[in-house]
């Protein structure tokens, strides 16, 4: 559903799908949504933001000759971003920020006649950061951009047992920062 009035714009959608699968223990369902809002501040600036979420659960029945019971994945994924853009003709740029994340709960399942797993696998992950840049076009055929990027990504994974004990598998976060200067020059309307 999209909606525009004056300098304001929006788009929102929601979806749900499901199936019982083609075999026992092969169900799947997903619910996801997306929303984007925008506002034109004036002739030079506009701001936008969006968020997307997906929650799904699926079962893996295993091979026909080696079936599985309770091989179930529960997953939540999300992403969001914010952008402030400027455009003055000969110069333009933006501040862009983003955050992506996920939470996973997985049961590896067991074979018929076997014993259920004494633990579940869990993991959380993230990827966040921002970009700040400005481009200048002061001479015909020439573009000069200066900017900085920052990113923080990582996650952790663990096993959670039915008796309450947890076994951490990994927990790591990485920070990255990069500044840059880029110049492009068109040559003979063919090469840049």
Where are these regions (language model features)?
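Residues on the lipid-exposed face of transmembrane beta-strands in outer-membrane beta-barrel proteins
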Residues: 1-3, 35-39, 80-86, 130-136, ...
């Amino acid at each position: 559903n999209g909606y525009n009035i004056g300098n304001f714009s929006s788009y929102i959608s929601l979806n749900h799908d499901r199936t019982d699968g083609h075999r026992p223990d092969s169900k799947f369902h997903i619910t996801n949504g997306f929303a984007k809002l925008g506002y034109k501040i004036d002739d030079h600036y506009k701001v936008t933001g969006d968020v997307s979420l997906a929650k799904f659960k699926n079962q893996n029945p295993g091979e026909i000759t080696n079936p599985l019971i309770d091989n179930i994945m529960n997953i939540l994924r999300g992403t969001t971003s914010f952008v402030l853009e400027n455009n003055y003709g000969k110069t333009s740029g933006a501040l862009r920020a983003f955050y992506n994340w996920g939470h996973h709960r997985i049961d590896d399942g067991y074979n018929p006649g076997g014993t259920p797993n004494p633990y579940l696998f869990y993991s959380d992950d993230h990827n966040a950061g921002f970009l700040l840049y400005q481009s200048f076009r002061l001479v015909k055929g020439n573009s000069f951009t200066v900017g900085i990027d920052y990113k923080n990504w990582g996650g952790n994974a663990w096993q959670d047992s039915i008796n309450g004990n947890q076994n951490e598998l990994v927990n790591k976060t990485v920070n990255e920062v990069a500044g840059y200067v880029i110049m492009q020059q068109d040559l003979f309307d063919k090469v840049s």
